[in-house]
């Protein structure tokens, strides 16, 4: 039997395509080693994407991390030790016994929109925070302000109802930056500040880019362009650094590999502390934990150093109270409760628990909490306290632990600066109430001089430690990594800011990663929205609509209009049912979206204003009807998180997910069909056994593992492609496909294995049919029999599998999207679920239901086109 000459040609074409996709880094903007692009552009990796870009409306640490000091500035700023320094206010005076603050503003300052920063703008900024409908999460910090007055264009007066010793510290927070009256309403998507960088572009799910502010009132930045890239997965962060896709990573999320970068001369590293106190939170409303002896026993049972070594791989600073070690007022109280299990057992016996007791430890999602929980549970077990661990998602944790106080213990990090005053709140989730502690907080708020405040701060620390309010574990570490040629990149310990105002490359670097991954922002509009081209979506939509129309016309012609109308009716009924089911499930899911958005320190007034703004104060039924009515008009609603239309969000993500799914399906089909045909033709032979074994391996290998392997080989070792990310279709077809080829291949391999096995089985079954024997009797060769007679009759189950695979690949690729940090639909859905962005979850699920039902409908109609027997039945 002579083999078909087409097979080697097909293999050659596939091989050539692979070489073009993987072997032409210049065409796709692939990276080289660190320091291989333009010397005045930098890309910084960060783990979290900011939900909006207005620091005055959301407490997300990611907003402060990238915007504070770079785009926005405040009247004052924090020094590294927590003291207050001038910024937009060059000096200030405190008079009237601490009841009046007069700020003298820096001259010649302008906002990025060209408007002047003066006392009127400063008054607008503070009045906006204090307004009754304000959604500022830290509004309560300025509650003692009675009036804000303009003295002259460069002088601002703030009057208080009573002394506020922490006012200057509060004004240094990111929530109180100065905003332009003319553009403040649009800051959520197009931020306008006074900083050394201007906002340029936000590619949601992928990156945010700033450009140098040439009119900056201070010393201009040396970098012309800065891009912050969102990389949530620790393995992806590692790969992005090693491949040179990013020049730096702020708060590197994988402490287990940090030492490798510290030993690599290509990188510089920094280990420091943050404002986040990691504590074993105790609910003193629960009987055993309300006893001081029990709480002290727990403190003696904890071995902080073992917890740090096991949970944080040795990075972190032991603490003995709720206070950051980098603050000048810090008091080291770790020696108050040394690790002493015998002492712990003695205290438990004295409290009436000689045999210990049982508790539940509810843990939020972060890895530090889960790893610490394992160690804490083991240490408490040594003194007789039996711990049952329960893992929660953030929304569940906020609902059960923080809001309803339904917990015994929890482990969580408190990241807000100067947040020791939370222990003075009786309604706080710890359940701690102390008249003496409240008196200390009141005295601190009434004290203005630094020595007096320092003494009171140390008394506050000692009181919390003596009362063993919580098990104080460690100050969360700050782990930063950057290109060794990148100088003067500063990382703030208090607000977590990545300060790029002085950053620059030394003479040994020819470029930063931004130069490798794109040509800067000479592309696209700088309007602040995602500038990815909608053309691929429009083309795909037009193509799918044309295919659907053709299939519908064929079905109507062969089976009649009644059949087609019936199928369309089933599709419509399914969608209507899906909207109701999805809405109900989302509404009964635990977790308050407003609490998630506003954080643990938000005051009730700001939360109520936000709830009203989002329409969450409306009853469920009217809200459902309003949503469905919008769907009928093509309006999916507005995202709680991003504050933009959900339809726009979905369209942006489909520009990645739809081509990714199509490319993965194309690759899986191109691999599966030859494998199945060869295996079926040579069934029972050695080649069949080898191919069957390969498909079995394809089923067994997880696609995310394969994806990481591909990244390590082609991005980290060979530097042929980027480790991840998506440059946008505006960067060119080659760049877009180059970014999708590895994730598509990782997705395609398991799907190809499934498809090959299904097709092989269908072909073997078909080869026993009478018409196959007839074809052979007429002299047809084996390959002709397979290709012309067996394959068309075996395609029905294959089409079913292909339809299911496309639906899965469209939104089920969330793990691969995280590995390759792609801004796809699956990642959007996952983030929306975690963030309790209900309207996005509802809309994405309904869209996916529509996709699944539509694809299934089209697959059913396509059966008559590929199967000769069905065509004959249709004609009959």
Q: Could you describe each region identified by the protein language model?
A:
Residues 43, 118-127, 153-157, 195-196, ...:
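Alpha-helical secondary-structure segments
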Residues 104, 138-181, 201:
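Surface-exposed binding/hinge segments that line
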Residues 164, 169-221, 225, 233-235, ...:
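Gly/Pro-rich hinge or "lid" segments in bacterial periplasmic/extracellular proteins
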Residues 185, 214-259, 377, 386-388:
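Ligand-site clamp/hinge motif
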Residues 203, 301-329, 368-377, 395-527:
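Detector for C-terminal structural segments
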Residues 530-533, 617-673:
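An internal, D/E-rich "acidic patch" concept
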Residues 561-562, 572, 578, 654-687, ...:
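Alpha-helical transmembrane segments of integral membrane proteins
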